[in-house]
Amino acid sequence: MSRRRTPKKRVIAPDALYNSVLVHTIVNHLMKKGKKSLAYMMFYETLSEIKQKTEQDPLEVIQKAVNNVRPLVIVKSRRVSGSTRQVPLSVDYEIGVALAIRWILAACRKRVGKSMISKMTNEFLDASKNIGNAIRKKDEIAKMAQANRAYARF
């Protein structure tokens, strides 16, 4: 265990247009090679497409999608008496949201389609309806945790 002090939690500033920390977090995960303005442009375009398709508040759809994908338990590999076991662990809210965003964006990148904007739109809509590859990933992890719950004490 480290003897150093625990680092301070960084405060994430909300984005300018929607005043939402979640939007800023998603944009940070979406960004590649430091191109934040491109990531913002893509995500704002995704939000406008969601608004056109559903005629609902796009932030509510995004929040619902992230909450649907957010895992409650994950499995971590632990070495126990000479063999490696998958040990289920409960997940904090912030870590769960980060995992959900990562899984949704990974599912977007796997999708077949023309643009990343349309792929993100479809994946967020699917996740808000409890379908799609990100939900499948969450269910897979939950099944693995359920199967290995005997090792939860490690």
Curated annotation (Swiss-Prot):
Keyword RNA-binding in annotation: yes
The entry's keywords: Chloroplast, Plastid, Ribonucleoprotein, Ribosomal protein, RNA-binding, rRNA-binding
UniProt record similarity statement: Belongs to the universal ribosomal protein uS7 family.
GO CC list: chloroplast; small ribosomal subunit
UniProt main location, coarse: plastid
PROSITE patterns in UniProt: RIBOSOMAL_S7 (PS00052)
NCBIfam families the UniProt entry points to: rpsG_bact
Keyword Ion transport: no
Any Gene Ontology biological process: translation
PANTHER family with a match to the protein in the record: RIBOSOMAL PROTEIN S7
CDD domains to which the protein is assigned, alphabetical: uS7_Chloroplast
Name listed for the protein in its UniProt record: Small ribosomal subunit protein uS7c
Role of this protein: One of the primary rRNA binding proteins, it binds directly to 16S rRNA where it nucleates assembly of the head domain of the 30S subunit.
InterPro entries per record: Ribosomal_uS7 (IPR000235), Ribosomal_uS7_bac/org-type (IPR005717), Ribosomal_uS7_CS (IPR020606), Ribosomal_uS7_dom (IPR023798), Ribosomal_uS7_dom_sf (IPR036823)
HAMAP family: Ribosomal_uS7_B
UniProt-annotated location(s): Plastid, Chloroplast
Subunit structure: Part of the 30S ribosomal subunit.
GO molecular function: rRNA binding; structural constituent of ribosome
Gene source species: Pleurastrum terricola (Filamentous green alga)
